[in-house]
Amino acid sequence: MPVPSKERVTELISDLVQRQGYDLEDVAVTLAGRHSAVRIMVDSDAGLELDAVANLSHEISEVFDSVSDFGESPYTLEVTSPGIGRPLTHERHWRRARGRRARIDLAHETVVGRIGLLDGDSVAVVIGSRTGPEVRRVALPDIQKAVVQVEFSKPDPRELELAGGIPEGRVAPADADASGDEEVVEGLDK
């Protein structure tokens, strides 16, 4: 019997993920011949810790072992955070990315700036200029695509201040990007 569909995996684990305090960001099921992969992306406002993700991975594995959907086919289970390349599509993504630099594509222009506070249906974006950083409000419905950018140097303290700082439990931009600590992955081969 093949690995179950994305929808079935979501049905099996969504309550467990939510009870553990995480948001289920995505599920990907990859069929690769006789050995398939199930990748589960989770996140939370407080970020992810490796030990907690390892525990969640083991609990998800137990759920999969308790149902017949997986049959005898081998598969790899990977529980991970979305990582830096994920587009910002939900309000919670904007909240969690506060203080990070992002490329924001609008209908007629592209804005690159530091994500600030979310207020209703708009977000503050701190844009650097020759006279110093400035705050611009951008309506969420006007955003066609937004992706956090990798930073290799420490952010300007004034930009961070105008952006409202870094959310509690999140890693400062250059620290996360340089160390690779932002994406947490726990995998199991079954």
From Swiss-Prot:
The keyword tRNA processing does not apply. Disulfide bonds: none annotated. HAMAP family: RimP (MF_01077). Residues 159-190 are annotated as: Disordered. Belongs to the RimP family. This is Ribosome maturation factor RimP. Residues 178-190 have a biased composition (Acidic residues). It is found in: Cytoplasm. One of its GO terms (cellular component) is cytosol. The keyword Cytoplasm applies. It comes from the Bacteria.
